[in-house]
Amino acid sequence: MRKTNMWFLERLRGSGENGASRGEAGDKSSKGPLYSNVLTPDKIPDFFIPPKLPSGPTEAEGQADLGPSTSEQNLASPGPRRAPRSPRLPAKLASESRSLLKAATRHVIQIESAEDWTAEEATNADPQAQGAMSLPSVPKAQTSYGFATLAESPHTRRKESLFHSEHGALAQVGSPGAGRRRAGAKGNGGDGGSREVGGALMSPSRYFSGGESDTGSSAESSPFGSPLLSRSVSLLKGFAQDSQAKVSQLKQSVGRHGSLSADDSTPDTSPGVRRRLSRRATPEPGPESGQAPRGEHTVKMGTRGSVRLLAEYEAAQARLRVRLLAAEGLYDRPCDARSINCCVGLCLVPGKLQKQRSTIIKNSRHPIFNEDFFFDGLGPASVRKLALRIKVVNKGSSLKRDTLLGEEELPLTSLLPFL
């Protein structure tokens, strides 16, 4: 009885193990198609590396000499093979192999033999070294790799270079103050300074020739000695015209400084002395000097402040010009600055002729105008009879009325004392 039970248990155990193995195999077979995109050793495609070709034959000859590739042989062989994972794989492999063959036959580099080159030519074969060897006047240097190169740049040591120190003369000529200082430093008036500046400006060879180079370069190495620059003549003409204009301005300034008397031409060149000399040389304006008579006046506007203005009369054009400068003391300190809208009106009386009004200046207790007012058609007789009325008003905002700050009438003869 015990043997029968043991046999039955062994049969049950064996049937259970067989069923489990069959279930695992079924699961694997059912899960197989789900993971078909996983790359396994049996799914790796064949790769093709094109061979090195000794020469560049034509495409047909190259394909005939090389023969079919390994992948093409595998595709063409009728023997047993694995089923392809994709129906497009054979056509894709064939097209890739053909494109690789075409690329291999097309890109062929011809290399010359190394025995044809000498040691010096092989060292200085690059364009930079060849350019350095073509300039015999510029000093050479050798790099750590044995290549020949220039010890310094051939452009920054020439007279025509913008970085050269002598080109500071152009900057000094461009500023009138520098020209006056250089002219005043000369002991013999201003002729020496003007001749020096004129020579520096009017001799284009100082800037357009390589003969005066510090490195002693020849005409062949100079960039301006090349016949390719056929437009340099027009450049020279324009340069000469600008130079003549600058020289004439410099001569005029030098002549003004040289025309001073012996007692005025002191070595003191401070700004205060120059202002005193100009004030002494300037004549008083009047009818005999040919200048328009003018004068600045401060007009009191009653008890509230004043207005500063400048009057000038041009007899040749019969025109009176009044420049309104500023107004002062018209507003008290407690007044709100946001309500200030100052405006000045001008006219000629009697008759209120040629009424004019200034710009409204806001938010300022001391407004500054600096405006010009012109009164035309005034002969000398009319100027002696008419007067100028000045009316200062604070313009009201929104519904507020204008506020009169001051009004005054001045005869034109008091504004123009030279009439």
Curated annotation (Swiss-Prot):
Compositionally biased intervals (Low complexity): 75-94
GO cellular component, one term: cytosol
Residue intervals of the C2 domain: 303-419
Modification type Phosphoserine: residues: 259, 261, 270
Domain of life: Eukaryota
Keywords recorded for this protein, A-Z: Phosphoprotein
Biased composition (Polar residues): 212-225
Region called Disordered, residue ranges: 1-96, 115-136, 151-225, 247-300
Any matching Pfam family: C2
Cystine pairs: none
Signal sequence, renumbered to the chain: none
Composition-biased stretches (Gly residues): 186-196
Keyword Nucleotide-binding found: no
Record's keyword annotation contains Translocase: no
Family: Belongs to the C2CD4 family.
Protein name: C2 calcium-dependent domain-containing protein 4C
